[in-house]
Amino acid sequence: MGVKNYLIEGVSCTGKTSVCDELRRRGYHSINGDRDLAYWGDPKTGEPLDGSAYEHHTWIWDVDKVRALVADQSHAASFFCGGSRNFDRFIDLFDGVFVLEVDLDTLNRRLAARPEDEWGDHVVGDHGRASEREFIARLHATKEDIPKNAITIDATAPLSRVVDAILGNANLVSP
């Protein structure tokens, strides 16, 4: 959707949705991947899964939709914000990749403040919210499901500074 396309990733609670909203507020074309592109599917084939197979690694983006949006160059820049476990199937389409990162205390504080319906037990199976938090803390520590060789953005900073850092690294200024 842009002449330049950027991916903004990170583990849960790093601020991907907030960044997307702030980019939109500033006039940038931004896609909330978790709302507009994601579904539960097989990461290799893209086939949708039934409710019994919902696991963290099956939260994927529709690769054909991503390719179509990237091919549409009606915007000077587009930002794709969200988590996808099949990013390896389309990451090469992006001009830049940013990973939002927070410290463990910030992560735990944001997790505790999340609404009950923000994400369900299906994220890691039927083990409850405590297991979800442990799982997210493990992902935070291992960085096992986020893009490598990305530009790391300190997302503990105020939102305006986080977005300024992304725009600066993309050599963009607010429209």
Whereabouts are the PLM-identified features?
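Conserved glycine(s) of the Walker
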Residues: 15
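The Walker A (P-loop) glycine that initiates the GxxxxGKT/S ATP-binding motif of P-loop NTPases
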Residues: 10
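Small-molecule kinase domains that catalyze NTP-dependent phosphoryl transfer to phosphate-bearing small molecules
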Residues: 87, 113-168, 173-175
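Conserved phosphate-donor/acceptor-positioning beta-strand/loop module used by diverse small-molecule
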Residues: 93-114, 153
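Glycine-rich phosphate-binding loop used to anchor ATP phosphates in small-molecule kinases
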Residues: 53-101
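Conserved substrate/cofactor phosphate-moiety recognition/catalytic segment
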Residues: 21-66
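Conserved Walker
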Residues: 18
